[in-house]
Amino acid sequence: VKAGVLYLAAGANVFAIDGRTGETVWRWQPDSAEAGMVPSWQGVGLGEDLVFVGLRSAQVAALRQDTGELVWVESVGSVPQQAGGQVTTAPIHAVGKVFVGVANGDSGGQGRVVALDAATGDIAWTFFVVPRPGEFGHDTWPQDSDVWQVGGGGVWLVGTVDPDLGMVYFATGNPVPMFGGEIRAGDNLFTASVLALDMDTGDRRWHYQVVRHDIWDADIATPLLLYEAEIDGEPRKALAAMRADGLLFLFDRETGTPLTQIE
């Protein structure tokens, strides 16, 4: 909501609704059915007088807040795009960038977090959830196969940002195949994890994997929560993450240090 206008995604449309009268100010629909918003509950992001929305075609679009006119659209999928890649999170706007997650459902692919320039749509950086050869964590996947290329880790929950710390936080999904752990030996980083990334560069600041080698689809099930806490008389910037089985994890969001004992 901004200046009394509600902005929302519904089916294959983005609406601007007058909050006082309920009248439609404008409606925008992509050119093709394949590009429709997914899913309707993901919502939109606002910033710099633009409305940002994710598309089924693994694209992000920016619309003018006042008219709904398309300003830019940019692909955040792989090249060539992997089947099923979608932007399933509401875009987040902060410090001149738009942050989104990309997921392929449970069909594999490579989950990722992408940052785009809010004004132009140019991609600033991409962080792949499953590390590539030579990257930290790649050794947590089988070294004698290419299963990592379809290892999953879809980013399907909206993230959150702390501009003061310069970090953006996302939860990642389960590895793929979901229950076929025998073909993906290892911890399978950075699936089923909390990721803290540098907002400017996309570099990993810290991570915590809530399930190693997940074979239960027990990844994080709710958006991450940032909050302020007092521990031993000292103020702490904290983060809460809840796993699908209801276990709650609490972290110092600056360092990733657990605030409660984890066994």
Predicted regions located by residue number:
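Extracytoplasmic beta-rich repeat domains
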Residues: 1, 27-48, 70-90, 107, ...
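Short coil/turn segments that connect the beta-strands within blades of beta-propeller domains
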Residues: 3-5, 48-49, 95-97, 164-166, ...
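Residue position within the beta-strands of beta-propeller blades
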Residues: 8, 53, 100-101, 170, ...
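Beta-propeller domains
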Residues: 9-31, 186, 202
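Short glycine/acidic-enriched loop and turn motifs that connect beta-strands
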Residues: 13, 59, 105-108, 175-178, ...
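Short loop/turn segments that connect beta-strands within beta-propeller blades
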Residues: 18-21, 64-67, 117-120, 199-201, ...
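Repeat-solenoid scaffold signature
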Residues: 89-120, 213-263
